[in-house]
A protein has these predicted regions:
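Flexible "arm" and connector segments at domain edges
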Residues: 1-126
């Protein structure tokens, strides 16, 4: 008999899947503080797996853990989507693939001037 120790957050059906394979497992239900800590650890784990594979499966896992983190903090998925949409409206999304290279602070009469907005400030990244 061998025992492998995990001590990590798993999806809800994992214990049943393990038992249906003829193995047994020990699980416990976490309190709020411990759950949030394990969700944070799971976010790091899933992000690392996504960064290594760039697979849609790992991206979906990451999304699932983000949803769990939102719920653990008392937010609904609608709350998360509302804030995401507000930020996208106010600051944009990442659709244009812009890489900020540098910022020049131009001072004119004691006031910070704004750079012109438009396509002329966008160039290809080499």
């Amino acid at each position: 008999m061998s025992i492998k120790h995990y001590d990590k957050l798993v999806r809800d059906k994992i214990p049943q899947i393990i038992e249906s394979s003829g193995k047994s497992c020990t699980v416990c239900r976490l309190d709020d503080e411990s759950y949030l800590r394990k969700v944070d650890e799971k976010l790091q784990e899933e992000l690392a797996e996504y960064l290594e594979s760039h697979s849609i499966e790992e991206l979906a896992d990451l999304c699932e853990v983000v949803r769990a983190a939102a719920r653990a903090l008392g937010y609904t998925i609608d709350d998360l989507e509302r804030v995401r949409a507000e930020k996208a409206r106010a600051r944009g999304a990442f659709d244009e693939r812009l890489l900020l290279v540098d910022v020049v602070d131009v001072v004119d009469n004691g006031a910070i001037g704004d750079a012109p907005v438009g396509a002329d400030w966008v160039s290809s990244c080499d």
